[in-house]
């Protein structure tokens, strides 16, 4: 769910006007840019509820990794990510969570936006359930269960030239990227384990970046609780 960063400068040295050599118009990467989102998670019945919060993400500047030009961004929850932008597109190469003192290289690059922006472009990355939970077990979140810590999600560019309205404004010429994963869960209606879909939708707009995200995680039994998470851009600098 974290994808937008920072690259190169206006000269050989790092300056205040950093930007990537291969700028992606759907991924503004200049140091100092920030995005604030309203985050709303609607949990399914029984015991439905809605959790609301805000998330701010900021580009922190160039921070080379493994001898290659790399750019760091940080969320106000303390998570950090390192990205590159080159002929392959924009992709993540390392991350650090809020409780860790060190960053970790990704085993494989994690594509955010491919260089080839066509509907024929397909790619995959690993993911975890963001908020799907168990009602009567600890820890409740599926993302902490070994079986669900490395779920393959297949992505594609589903639509282009989209118009998106969020609290930050109305944006045109946007890109819709959709990810689909199958996770094996107990399905109460069939009294069996079954692969069920987990769906991710992201809208990226020119010169702005990510403006909206939706994540669907299924409720398949009374002792599970899924729903829909939505992130909408409320301001950017």
Predicted regions: what is each one?
Residues 1-4:
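Positively charged n-region of N-terminal signal peptides that target proteins for export
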Residues 6-9:
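Sec-dependent N-terminal signal peptides
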Residues 14-16:
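C-terminal motif of bacterial Sec signal peptides marking the signal peptidase cleavage site
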Residues 18-237:
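Conserved functional acidic sites
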